[in-house]
Regions:
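Catalytic core of non-heme Fe(II) oxygenases with the double-stranded beta-helix
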Residues: 88-165, 175, 182-183, 197-202
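Double-stranded beta-helix
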Residues: 188-204
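Short, charged beta-turn/beta-strand-edge "cap" motif at the junction between a beta-strand
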Residues: 170-173
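Histidine-centered catalytic/metal-coordination loop motif
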Residues: 20-45
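Short, small-residue-biased leader/transition segments that mark boundaries at the very start
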Residues: 1-11
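Signature of the catalytic double-stranded beta-helix
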Residues: 39-105
Length: 204
């Protein structure tokens, strides 16, 4: 797992604003929304999911941002320089009250998710639970099973401008939120890097 750091809040804010402006226009354009619809290929039970066009990925800086983050991540973790970053696809998830994304994983080598809009409140426990973290609207990463001194899940509270990167096979889910009619808007992607760097166990 890698959280984007060190690239500057202003730069990330510009990307978020550019993408949100583009998305708002797509939402208003019914024919374009239908053309870019990606929901039938995804597992989410949410209001809308649609693919990003190549032009906006270039103009917003989203594609370069991903390439830079992944390159830095691989260098920090493996001390290796990637020579290939192929963005396979990127899409928007528009989630509203009581909607969710079940446990799933992605294709490619590297995947990730980031947050473009987050409601002010995501709800609270139905019962009084003082010592239990409320997870409505959270992104949860899942790997293996719980063992001694080792948790199998990691919960991420969504915050606008935060972006997370992980291997494509890492299972994850998004919990429903409640008591708020506002939109939770996220962005995801799949990408390939050098096969000899990704395939640490030898040739496939």
């Amino acid at each position: 797992l890698r959280r984007s750091r060190g690239l500057g809040d202003v730069y990330k804010r510009q990307i978020v604003n550019s993408l949100n402006s583009y998305i708002d226009n797509i939402v208003e354009n019914k024919s374009k929304s239908k053309e870019l619809n990606h929901g039938e290929k995804l597992v989410g039970d949410v209001t809308q999911e649609f693919k990003l066009e190549e032009q906006i990925m270039k103009e917003s800086g989203w594609g370069n941002f991903l390439a830079n983050c992944v390159s830095t991540w691989i260098d920090l973790e493996l001390k290796k320089k990637i020579s290939k970053f192929q963005l396979v696809n990127s899409w928007i998830v528009r989630q509203f009250e009581n909607e969710y994304n079940p446990t799933h994983w992605h294709g490619g080598h590297i995947s990730g998710a980031g947050f473009l809009k987050v409601p002010e409140t995501l709800g609270k426990h139905v019962q009084e639970k003082q010592n239990r973290e409320y997870r409505g609207g959270n992104l949860q990463l899942i790997h293996g099973s719980r063992m001694f001194l080792c948790h199998s899940t990691m919960n991420i509270v969504p915050k606008v401008g935060d972006f997370y990167f992980f291997p494509n096979y890492l299972m994850h889910t998004v919990f429903p939120f409640k008591n708020n009619k506002d939109e939770r808007r996220s962005i995801s992607f799949n990408a390939y890097i050098d096969n000899d760097i990704y395939n640490v166990y030898g040739k496939a």
